[in-house]
């Protein structure tokens, strides 16, 4: 494996870890700097996470398995560049809602 492929693979792995960590913690900081437990929304089944898409920030529940899809990873990189992952707005995907629906239906 070339060095370029290795470095790209490492960057993807780091990004996926950060997203999974963010999705799995879903807690809010308490005054002591730690996290307190917060119940997940009832409409988010185990193995899934919510994302917000488009200008209207429409909410979608997607399976964690999407994180391994290269096209979905591309959307996540765009989200990281535009919004970053360390904010309280939820994971926001900066793309047209129709495009997102088409992409996710192809992934499924």
Curated annotation (Swiss-Prot):
It is found in: Cell membrane. It holds the Pfam family Auxin_inducible. The keyword Oxidoreductase does not apply. Expressed in seedlings, leaves and flowers. One of its GO terms (biological process) is response to abscisic acid. One of its GO terms (cellular component) is plasma membrane. Provide a mechanistic link between auxin and plasma membrane H(+)-ATPases (PM H(+)-ATPases, e.g. AHA1 and AHA2), and triggers PM H(+)-ATPases activity by promoting phosphorylation of their C-terminal autoinhibitory domain as a result of PP2C-D subfamily of type 2C phosphatases inhibition, thus leading to the acidification of the apoplast and the facilitation of solutes and water uptake to drive cell expansion. Triggers plant growth probably by promoting cell elongation. Regulates branch angles and bending. Belongs to the ARG7 family. This is Protein SMALL AUXIN UP-REGULATED RNA 8. It comes from Arabidopsis thaliana. The lineage of its organism: Eukaryota, Viridiplantae, Streptophyta, Embryophyta, Tracheophyta.
